[in-house]
Amino acid sequence: MSKPANTTSTIIPCLRYRNALAMIDWLCEAFGFQKHTVYAEGDNVHHAQLVFGNGMVMLGSTSNAGEWGQAIVQPEEIGGRETQSACVIVTDADAHYARAVAAGATIVIDIADQPYGGRGYACKDPESHHWWFGSYDPWAEPAQA
């Protein structure tokens, strides 16, 4: 069996967007991502990497899907549903929530304290990809009962 690579993040969600260039800017404004790299020709994004802390998402244009991207559909193509979503750990869930709402994110689950710890909320971006943001850190030591 192959071992994980010795790198910052070994699991990186990949997304496809109809207007990837606009979504890159929106994800940075609304969620606080930072551009790591963007390979584009005109409006067509071949590949982009956005970072948040030590995590990353990769994305590209639906019009340039290639063999791998053809297996990935837009949420609106399947009734607005997702088969998976990114969960992002933030230090201040309330401040992040306010930032996302101000940028026009659609709130799916309002911000609340979670029974397993932390505070969080779920939202959709303008192209209906679902995101979870919260302060619960699954890597932290469990609280003593």
Label each region the model flagged.
Residues E127:
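C-terminal catalytic core of tyrosine-transesterase DNA break-rejoin enzymes
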Residues R16-N19:
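Short, surface-exposed ligand-recognition loops at beta-strand->loop->(often short) alpha-helix junctions
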Residues M1-C14, I24-K124, S135-A145:
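Vicinal oxygen chelate
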